[in-house]
Amino acid sequence: MLRFLEVVSEHIKNLRNHIDLETVGEMIKLIDSARSIFVIGAGRSGYIAKAFAMRLMHLGYTVYVVGETVTPRITDQDVLVAISGSGETTSVVNISKKAKDIGSKLVAVTGKRDSSLAKMADVVMVVKGKMKQERDEILSQLAPLGTMFELTAMIFLDALVAEIMMQKHLTEKDLEARHAVLE
């Protein structure tokens, strides 16, 4: 357990040391200029996308999760945030392509800059973390499959939320006003 926490801590330090602040600014600009924000991810990356969508809603954005029954049509005034460690997840790549064909902006959060998802994106945030296709015997025993990418992506997106809060001078109280009460 302690070894796992050490590995996670190292990945967070790596994220901090390699974060591209210019790309962060571009992401925020796209999010701010969008009529609506749509998020997508498959499997555990999908859970990360949903958590990010919740925080965007708390910040006051209009946000939808792709695949939910109440999700409307995406338009050329919207942005899609797509999360995929490999950048090759079939459903994520196909839906991202469709969004681009419609004229939507695309933000890719991925571990691979040369992936299909990254190549079609308007903004690419590379988040390093072992993907499920990579084999590292020690790391695979501690954090199997895409665990490190998923955790690192979640931390990055929460840091992005904190940055937006600071830029907009929002407080936890502001976010709390939009928090669910029907629980």
Curated annotation (Swiss-Prot):
Organism ancestry: Archaea, Methanobacteriati, Methanobacteriota, Archaeoglobi, Archaeoglobales
GO molecular function (one): isomerase activity
Protein name per its UniProtKB record: Uncharacterized protein AF_1796
All copies of domain SIS, residue ranges: 27-170
Domain of life: Archaea
GO BP annotations, alphabetical order: carbohydrate derivative metabolic process
InterPro entries: PHI/rmpB (IPR017552), SIS_dom (IPR001347), SIS_dom_sf (IPR046348)
Family membership: Belongs to the SIS family. PHI subfamily.
Organism: Archaeoglobus fulgidus (strain ATCC 49558 / DSM 4304 / JCM 9628 / NBRC 100126 / VC-16)
